[in-house]
Amino acid sequence: MQSADNLIWIDLEMTGLDVDSCKIIEIAAIITDKDLNIIAEAEPIAIHQSDEILNSMNEWCIKVHCETGLTQRVKDSKISTEAAEQQILEFIRKFVPYQSSPLCGNSIWQDRRFLAKYMPKIDEYCHYRMLDVTTLKLLNQYWGDGKGFEKKNTHKALDDIRESIAELKFYRQKLLSI
């Protein structure tokens, strides 16, 4: 059921960080309520990219995406960027009204840049505001005790979102008395 209080969490895995030359290879989404309880999860979608695109990845991406199995999933996938965008958009629309939720995640501006370029319908559907968990991590480093949330960093889109939600819960309890 749709609610303007629900939050849209998205994570992307890309072939690199340069929005002009790199591509999205995986997208996942989770919807939570405002108290960060998970309402629904969209299965992660591996997005097909050509061997030319995959071969242009830097060493870090090659290593990590190979270890997680994502590179092979991308090669095997028949799903285009446009089809993945449509699937995720349909998922989001079930739970969140148009432009009512900020885009939520860790270092979410980087994902937002890729969404704006390659999945503009999702970008437009989300409110222009963003809820970036990284901000609280940095505030804890600067003004808190510096003891942060321990992350596994699996670099799998759905796992990364779950971890971001858990991290926000951690910092909400630790830093915010609201």
Swiss-Prot record:
It holds the Pfam family RNase_T. It comes from the Bacteria. Gene3D superfamilies: Ribonuclease H-like superfamily/Ribonuclease H. Residues 7-168 form the Exonuclease domain. Keywords: Cytoplasm, Exonuclease, Hydrolase, Nuclease. GO terms for cellular component: cytoplasm. The active site is at Y128. SUPFAM superfamilies: Ribonuclease H-like. It is found in: Cytoplasm. InterPro entries: Exonuclease_RNaseT/DNA_pol3, Oligoribonuclease, RNaseH-like_sf, RNaseH_sf. Its EC number is 3.1.15.-. One of its GO terms (biological process) is DNA metabolic process. GO terms for molecular function: 3'-5'-RNA exonuclease activity; nucleic acid binding. Belongs to the oligoribonuclease family. 3'-to-5' exoribonuclease specific for small oligoribonucleotides. This is Oligoribonuclease. The gene is orn.
